[in-house]
Every structure is written in structure tokens, then in C-alpha cells.
Regions:
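Cell-envelope/extracellular polymer assembly enzymes that use nucleotide-activated donors
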Residues: 6-9, 38, 221
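Short, well-formed alpha-helical segments that are part of the catalytic scaffolds
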Residues: 17-30, 52
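Acidic donor-binding segment of Leloir-type glycosyltransferases
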Residues: 29-96
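A short, glycine-/small-residue-rich helix N-cap motif at loop->alpha-helix starts
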Residues: 77-79, 90, 94, 99-115, ...
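Short beta-strand-to-loop acidic/aromatic patch adjacent to the donor-nucleotide binding site
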Residues: 120-129
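Conserved donor NDP-sugar-binding/catalytic core segment of glycosyltransferases
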Residues: 136-169
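Conserved nucleotide-sugar donor-binding catalytic segment
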Residues: 156, 171-256
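Catalytic core of nucleotide-sugar-dependent glycosyltransferases
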Residues: 215, 242-245, 252-280, 302-314
Length: 331
């Protein structure tokens, strides 16, 4: 198959997001670009009917006429559909409907996308429950990265949509327009994953470096690897909506799951610190105790909070957060 010279691949990993995936796909197809881009949507054997939602959307909006570039094929692991949008001629979808759930088996999925991903210069990410709201997101990010070779990635501000209340507001966040060390110590880039675009060439060697690590998140170690020799820029414009669900890959009903996620963040930090900057370890540990302290408070786990408080220097700001947390729980 001869493909266009795709400049950007949009990676959308999704599972049981039947209620939300149409918003994500609308955000992709609305993108107005000066280059062709391919959206690789991987449904991880959803059980809520999401695959049917995706199929209908693709059938209704993409060109399957005689002489079109579209195709369907089956492999050992998936049913695959590739097609060009009917009206947005720069937009292509490559959809993989996986036959069995890979996440539960800890089986990697990114290798399935090499057919399209390997030819691209940049990659953007948006999971199935989030969505983009501006039509020039991809264009603006490509222009910025092409004009600023010292930057390896860029993101934007976001709106947070709380699913339980349906309230939407501009995320506050601490936006770090800087380097590897601040992201390593800070524990993140300060904005949502669905805002990000990065240079694919900077990922060379990533899989070998990570090896068999079983971290509970895929984005944070990716950001650190990208930022070893580059910087990140955050646009002040809110370009996306990040959906806050009661239970998701990074939001949890149970304290035990939330604590395990924070433990995994620390594991990533220490892994990279030992490889690149051991002087950051004391600050990483200090921040971890503080984060665990706040986490225990937010779940009303007083005993655990007291244990972590022994390692934290309590400031006036901390007391305000504690009071706010107690008041919130009391309501």
C-alpha cells in the first residue's frame, strides 16, 4: 500500500469509551492542516459496544467508494480498517479493532502501528475519553516544532470536564516550559497528555531503555525520555477537554489504587534519576512524601497521613489544604 507522506500520526488508545469516543473522533476530523495526518485508533477489545460506535462513525464519514484508498484486512490480533475522510482530504483513519484485550495481559500495542507511525515526523496523543476543541491544534504545534528545533515537544492548556457533575473549567496546572530536571522532580509536565505533540525521532532507543518495567502509566516516562536533550513548550491557549472520570487510568475510587499509582510515579522518577541525575533523588523523595501525605488526606486516611507527615515540613499553605480537604469530606 502506498500511503501519503504523513507528517503527523495521532495515537488514540481506547477501551470501553463508547460514550465518549465520538467526541474524540470529531476532534480529529475537524483538524485543518497543510499536511496529511493519520489517526491510529486502537480499540483494546472493548465490551461496551465501542467498536460498533467507531465502525459506524468511520462508515458514515470516510470514503469507501470504488477507487478510494480504503481497505479492510484481518490479522492474527485485529481487524483493521484504513480510509480517507470524505471532505477533510488531509485526514486519514487507521482503526485497529483488537480481538483480545492487551492491557490485561500487559501486551504492548504500539508495534502494531509501525506501518503508519514510522513514516511520520511527529506524534500527537489523545485517548478515547478526551477530545480536542480547536481546529488548528495540529497545525500550530507542527509550526512551532518546525521553527524551534531545540524543543522536542509541546502541549497546551486544557479544560477539565468532571464527569460526575458535568462541570467544565479551565485547568489551573503548573505549566513547566523548561527542562528534564524540573519535570523529573515535579513528577509531570503540568498539563494533560491529550494536549501533547512530540518529535518521534527522539524516541529512538526508548523501548530498550525502559526494558521490562511495569509502570502504571505510559506518558510520564515517555516525557522524561523525550526531554533528556530537549525542552517542552506549553501554549497558553486551552486546546482540549480532559475528562475526569470517577475511575480511569489515573483517577481512582480506592485509596489503594491511587497510592499504587503515586508509587509508580516515584519508581519512574528514581529510574530516570539513577540513569541521568542522581542529585535529584533527595528532592524526589521529599516531594513523594508530600504527595503521599496529600493523597492520604484526600481519601480521609488519617493514620497514613500522619505517618507521611513525619517526613514533611508542614507550611501554612499545607494547613490551608488540610482544612479544605477536611471541609470537602465533611460535605
Amino acid at each position: 500500500m502506498e500511503y501519503p507522506k504523513f507528517k503527523v500520526t495521532v495515537s488514540c488508545m481506547t477501551f470501553n469509551q463508547a460514550k465518549y469516543i465520538t467526541d474524540a473522533m470529531n476532534g480529529f476530523t475537524m483538524q485543518q492542516t497543510s499536511f496529511p495526518f493519520v489517526c491510529t485508533i486502537v480499540d483494546d477489545a472493548s465490551t461496551d459496544g465501542e467498536q460498533d460506535v467507531i465502525r459506524k462513525y468511520v462508515e458514515d464519514n470516510f470514503d469507501f467508494s470504488e477507487g478510494s484508498v480504503s481497505y479492510h484486512k484481518e490479522t492474527d490480533y485485529a481487524h483493521i480498517t484504513y480510509a480517507q475522510h470524505k471532505t477533510n482530504k488531509n485526514c486519514y483513519f487507521a482503526v485497529l479493532y483488537l480481538k483480545e484485550n492487551h492491557y490485561s495481559q500487559r501486551k504492548p500495542k504500539m508495534g502494531y502501528l509501525s506501518e503508519w507511525r514510522d513514516m511520520c515526523e511527529y506524534e500527537a496523543i489523545c485517548e478515547g475519553d478526551d477530545y480536542w476543541i480547536v481546529p488548528d491544534k495540529l497545525e500550530k504545534q507542527v509550526v512551532f516544532l518546525s521553527e524551534n528545533p531545540d524543543y522536542g515537544m509541546c502541549g497546551s492548556r486544557a479544560y477539565n470536564l468532571t464527569e460526575l457533575t458535568q462541570k467544565i473549567r479551565r485547568a489551573k496546572g503548573s505549566y513547566r516550559n523548561n527542562d528534564f530536571n524540573s519535570v523529573l522532580i515535579g513528577g509531570g509536565i503540568g498539563t494533560a497528555t491529550c494536549t501533547v505533540m512530540y518529535r518521534l525521532k527522539l524516541l529512538k532507543g526508548y523501548r530498550d531503555f525502559v526494558g521490562s518495567q511495569k509502570w502504571l502509566m505510559g506518558d510520564f516516562p515517555l516525557w522524561l525520555y523525550l526531554l533528556r536533550d530537549s525542552k517542552i513548550h506549553i501554549f497558553d491557549e486551552a486546546m482540549v477537554v480532559y475528562r475526569i472520570l470517577q475511575e480511569s487510568a489515573s483517577h481512582f475510587k480506592s485509596y489503594e489504587k491511587a497510592k499504587a499509582f503515586q508509587d509508580s510515579v516515584r519508581s519512574v522518577q528514581l529510574y530516570f534519576a539513577h540513569a541521568y541525575d542522581e542529585t535529584a533523588i533527595p528532592k524526589i523523595e521529599e516531594n513523594n512524601f508530600r504527595n503521599q501525605f496529600y493523597l492520604a488526606l484526600s481519601y480521609a486516611r488519617t493514620k497514613e497521613a500522619i505517618n507521611y507527615a513525619k517526613h514533611v515540613k508542614i507550611t501554612f499553605k499545607d494547613y490551608l489544604i488540610i482544612i479544605k480537604s477536611i471541609f470537602k469530606r465533611a460535605r
